UniProtKB/Swiss-Prot annotation:
Domain of life: Bacteria
Name used for this protein in its record: Uncharacterized lipoprotein SAR0443
This protein's record includes keyword Membrane: yes
InterPro entries (UniProt xref): Csa (IPR007595), Csa_sf (IPR038641)
Keywords of the record: Cell membrane, Lipoprotein, Membrane, Palmitate, Signal
Lipidation (N-palmitoyl cysteine): C23
One Pfam family cited in the UniProt record for this chain: DUF576
Species: Staphylococcus aureus (strain MRSA252)
Gene3D superfamilies on file: 2.50.20.40
Lipid-conjugated positions (S-diacylglycerol cysteine): C23
Amino acid sequence: MRYLNRVVLYIIVMVLSVFIIGCDKSSDTSEKPKEDSKEAQIKKSFEKTLDMYPIKNLEDLYDKEGSRDGEFKKGDKGMWTIYTDFAKSNKQGGLSNEGMVLYLDRNTRTAKGHYFVKTFYEKDKFPDRKKYKVEMKNNKIILLDKVEDPKLKKRIENFKFFGQYANLKELKNYNNGDVSINENVPSYDAKFKMSNKDENVKQLRSRYNIPTDKAPVLKMHIDGNLKGSSVGYKKLEIDFSKGEKSDLSVIDSLNFQPAKVNEDDE
């Protein structure tokens, strides 16, 4: 009888030990949540700025602060840089792109930049580059340089950045992306297939000459820390290109950095 009691007691102790060890392991698991996939991390990094889209009034950026780091001097409120361009293959076998960059200084609450027209040739010829200074007041683009071409002048004065009409709050709807990483830079890229039914795609087709029914690819690129850095940058590209020798895309970026003395040096 005494032997049987010892056996029962031994079994109880063993069961309790297994139960306690199991609880400890489950506790460790709960304390160490599973790290997000690189695709999810790239999306989260972009969400910090894309959640602000559409920015219908660009002057709202004066009251919004981005991620700060040690590159910012004391008292510097920082500067937003917003950029959009449309690039396409040209008849000369090169590339033409046209767009605008605007620097919004939160310290002075002023916005200056330029509209650019660039033509790159396949070979044996230097590219053509033209810049036209602009500023923004009351959410309106004001052309500062003289432009002879009335069509170009109209395009500049009526220009809208992709971030002013895009809505990319539901990045989670883009799944199974093709992710590539270069740890040496570091840089991160993710590609997602888009649908022609996407409202962002419809907006681009209504604003630009896109002579293809091919559904585009959304490309997300990050240089620098995934959590954000004033040294690195992020950009989006909506690529309508038909093949390797065909370029047709819209590039967009919105980055927060320390304010510069002269934005035109960019």
